[in-house]
Amino acid sequence: MRVGGLMKKVKKFKYKRVRLYWQDIVSNPEWLTLAKAKDQMYSWCEDTGYLLHKDQKKVIIFASHSFDDDGELSVGNTTTYPRSVVKKIEVLK
């Protein structure tokens, strides 16, 4: 990476680009019959980013990254999901 005319050593980028498929809650402020209320469904969602962390409790991705002047990686636009709502993680090329 070139900074101010000097080449800085950048550490290897080791994070995989992924697409998450996850379920989100849906709320409705309207008055509904019981039958219509029971027919409501949750929402299927997709997000893409770089996989920062995954364990049995949570999944964390980030969408933006930058290497600081000293070569350290900084990340932005992080999203943390409860593991229970993430239904599939697809590694992208």
Regions found by a protein language model. Name each.
Residues 2-93:
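Conserved RNA-binding domains used in RNP assembly and mRNA/RNA metabolism
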